[in-house]
């Protein structure tokens, strides 16, 4: 199988790729290397720090877009798989759906949107932030809420 893994969180995609390659699959990882952790990847999609960093990353994504097609499975690490604005994500997602067999959304890592969604709409019966309709009051849940929502 041909598998594309987009994004990275705590070495999940890099180690998954290594295991899948051992099993004989063709795997490509495109990520920002999870920032300072510098995990391995095949296509580096790191956003710089300059005033034009977002534009440069967008150009890099467009330049590599042809490499993101004809896969049996594409897994994105979470809804914010690139350090770009949401409208750019929508364009990339449409391309991925059109040019690949299956698209899988992971829920790795944590970001503002994940925390907010789990607190407000509670799409999961059990999450880091809720048990059923009840918001979790434990220390870890409170720390994560403060870190991401202020």
What role is predicted for each listed range?
Residues 1-41, 99-101:
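N-terminal subdomain of nucleotide-sugar transferases
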Residues 50-56, 82, 133-141:
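Short, flexible loop segments at the rims of nucleotide/cofactor-binding pockets, characterized by
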């Amino acid at each position: 199988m041909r598998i594309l893994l987009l994004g990275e969180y705590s070495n999940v995609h890099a180690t998954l790729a290594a295991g899948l390659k051992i099993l004989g699959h063709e795997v490509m990882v495109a990520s920002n290397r999870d920032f300072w952790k510098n995990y391995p990847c095949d296509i580096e999609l790191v956003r710089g720090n300059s005033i034009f960093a977002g534009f440069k990353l967008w150009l890099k994504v467009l330049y590599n877009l042809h490499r993101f097609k004809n896969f049996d499975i594409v897994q994105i690490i979470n809804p914010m798989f690139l350090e770009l604005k949401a409208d750019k994500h929508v364009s990339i997602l449409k391309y991925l759906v059109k040019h690949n067999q299956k698209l899988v959304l992971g829920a790795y890592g944590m970001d503002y949107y994940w925390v907010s969604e789990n607190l407000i709409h509670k799409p999961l019966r059990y999450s880091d932030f809720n048990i059923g309709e009840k918001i979790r009051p434990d220390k870890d849940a409170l720390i994560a809420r403060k870190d991401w929502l202020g």
